[in-house]
Amino acid sequence: MQEELKELKEKALVDISEASSLDKLKDVQVKYLGKKGELTKILRGMGNLSPEERPVVGKLANEIRDDLEQAFEERENNLKEAEMQKRWEEEKIDVTLPGRVISRGAKHPLKKVLDEVHDIFLGMGYNIEEGPEIETDYYNFEALNIPKGHPAREMQDSLYITEEILLRTHTSPVQIRTMEQVAPEIPVRIICTGKVYRKDDDATHSPMFHQIEGLVVGERITLGDLKGTLLNFAKQMFGPEVDIRLRPSYFPFTEPSAEVDISCVICEGSGCRVCKGTGWLEILGSGMVHPKVFEMSGYDPDKVTGFAFGMGVERIAMLKYGIQDLRIFFENDKRMVNQFK
């Protein structure tokens, strides 16, 4: 039995030295010193020894157990130190390396245009108002002189949620909500910007786009005031050489109504492919606020007048930056955005 114990010790020491990880070392420890380990199996045969041999074998077994436990502890410490050294090598930071360059972002062209529009109209004394994107049929249509069955409703393919609730098709409802809140106080000078929704999707239309709406209410407000305001806006947005013209049009919520064109920013009015040879580019719709809209908003149309206008932010950005396809704005292509740093 003494020879068996000595052979076990030699074999165990070899296995301990060859254990390449803490998990493997644990397996070796269980194999030799566990409750069902090799050493335990040998010691179970001590009952067959003579009384003279038992103390000798017992002493040898305890010495071997102590030697193996010490060997396990030393190997465990060595493996832990090696593992720590490996982690240190993998995780250490070379402070002499140059830092990672953080790329500089760029403002989206739509955001640039919105900010510029805000600055222009804030400089003219306007306030900025906001309203809900999910709107009632009343505010989106009826309060704007577009009752149920009105032909003008067919001009806009609306996205309804229920029979009376829809995604707003324009930002004009904000004008109604604002007038209801402040009526009959004057003057009112506001612009409202935000997302609007229609069933359109092609190179010049999107199911979601951004609109800017303007409203002025006061005494003796005239069409001349409207033209002067829009001319001032156009010159600040597109350049001092730009001119505008008003063409008769129709909108249910204004009377009279006018489409507004600017002289072509590409050919400066001489005629080109972009303006189709006319020298003019359409940018917005406008007009004098309809008396029925005043009545439904709490104002007396015999005492006040006003004008309103609306334009698409994407349309302004396309003209300002020479972008041909509106869908580019929504493709999240950093190459396009980075051009506007």
From Swiss-Prot:
What's the top EC group for this one?
ligase
PANTHER family tied to this protein = PHENYLALANINE--TRNA LIGASE, MITOCHONDRIAL, PHENYLALANYL-TRNA SYNTHETASE
Entry's cofactor comment: Binds 2 magnesium ions per tetramer.
- Where found in the cell? Cytoplasm
Q: Which GO terms describe its biological process?
A: phenylalanyl-tRNA aminoacylation
Metal-binding listed as a keyword: yes
Q: Which GO terms describe its cellular component?
A: cytoplasm
Organism of origin: Natranaerobius thermophilus (strain ATCC BAA-1301 / DSM 18059 / JW/NM-WN-LF)
One GO MF term on file is:
catalytic activity, acting on a protein
Q: Which family does it belong to?
A: Belongs to the class-II aminoacyl-tRNA synthetase family. Phe-tRNA synthetase alpha subunit type 1 subfamily.
Q: Does the keyword Glycoprotein apply?
A: no
Q: Name one Pfam family in it.
A: Phe_tRNA-synt_N
How does this chain assemble?
A: Tetramer of two alpha and two beta subunits.
- Which cofactor does this sequence's record say it needs? Mg(2+)
Residue runs in coiled coils: none
Q: Specify the protein name.
A: Phenylalanine--tRNA ligase alpha subunit
Q: Which residues bind Mg(2+)?
A: E255
What is this protein's gene name?
pheS
Q: What is its EC number?
A: 6.1.1.20
**Which terms are listed as keywords in the entry?**
Aminoacyl-tRNA synthetase, ATP-binding, Cytoplasm, Ligase, Magnesium, Metal-binding, Nucleotide-binding, Protein biosynthesis
